């Protein structure tokens, strides 16, 4: 139990608790997407950065309802692709409120299409113009 509590504290302290969220617009169905460029960390061609999905209406995951999700993303700057590392589901908007659930299963790399919000996030993470 102490290990779970410690890992949760570490994730939250490494995450965007007092983030400087930059809006990237709406992504259909009332979801606003934000990123915090101050959380970027680079390792070669790969960059990690926190992204926030803020919902106008409650979303369901299993039996919990949440209004925002903070995602720790990894971007490949050599190729336009990304993968999710961790997602934290939060009860309130803009990442505020109680943490309801957390998932950190390794995901697969997903290609990024030009002209999408994902492409804009990739450009921010990788310092592309």
Q: Model features per residue range: what roles?
A:
Residues 16-129:
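N-terminal secretory-pathway/extracellular module detecting exported/lumenal segments
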Residues 4-13:
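Sec-dependent N-terminal signal peptides
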